[in-house]
């Protein structure tokens, strides 16, 4: 497993260094660049597109941060990357786009979003693992879904993984934590 000391050695900009009042939204190119410029590590979220491409976006639906609506998972990466974020010059982007922009200059803590109760998509996890394999900077992944982390362990055992929880419901879910 890789060195994880970077996770506690400097601040981590949650969803990038964003500030809505200056037109810099969470998980955007601008927020990520601002975090890099400040010397912070960066936490971002990944949603699955209809064609299994990791999209840098927090919400399950497009409604809150774009002028579009509906689930992210029902659109292709080509469709999603054409969607502008409200009030900005930024658009939705892929994990590969993010990795190209950051270019190893910052640690990345990546949250893999989940469809709890449904079979996790191996192709989606494989795509994430393949992209992260080429990243030259430090990286770790996390998820609320133990199945996603178990699949990441299979696909990329050297990438550090972290389990997230938000209540008693998770105690039952994380009973299988040895697979993570």
Question: What do the PLM-derived regions correspond to, one by one?
Answer:
Residues 1-180:
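Phosphate-group recognition and catalysis centered on beta-loop-alpha active-site segments
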């Amino acid at each position: 497993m890789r060195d994880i000391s970077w996770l506690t050695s400097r601040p981590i900009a949650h969803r990038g260094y964003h500030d809505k009042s200056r037109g810099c939204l969470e998980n955007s190119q601008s927020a990520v660049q601002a975090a890099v410029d400040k010397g912070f590590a960066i936490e971002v979220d990944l949603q699955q597109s209809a064609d299994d491409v990791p999209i840098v976006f927090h919400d399950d639906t497009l409604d809150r941060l774009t002028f579009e609506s509906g689930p992210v998972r029902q659109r292709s990466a080509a469709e999603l990357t054409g969607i502008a974020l409200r009030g900005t010059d930024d658009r939705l982007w892929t994990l590969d786009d993010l990795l190209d922009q950051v270019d190893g200059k910052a640690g990345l803590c990546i949250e893999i979003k989940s469809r709890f109760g449904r079979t996790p998509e191996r192709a989606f996890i494989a795509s994430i693992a393949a992209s992260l394999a080429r990243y030259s900077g430090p990286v770790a992944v996390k998820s609320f879904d133990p199945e996603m982390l178990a699949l990441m362990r299979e696909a990329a055992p050297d990438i550090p993984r972290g389990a997230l929880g938000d209540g008693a419901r998770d105690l039952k879910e994380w009973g299988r934590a040895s697979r993570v």
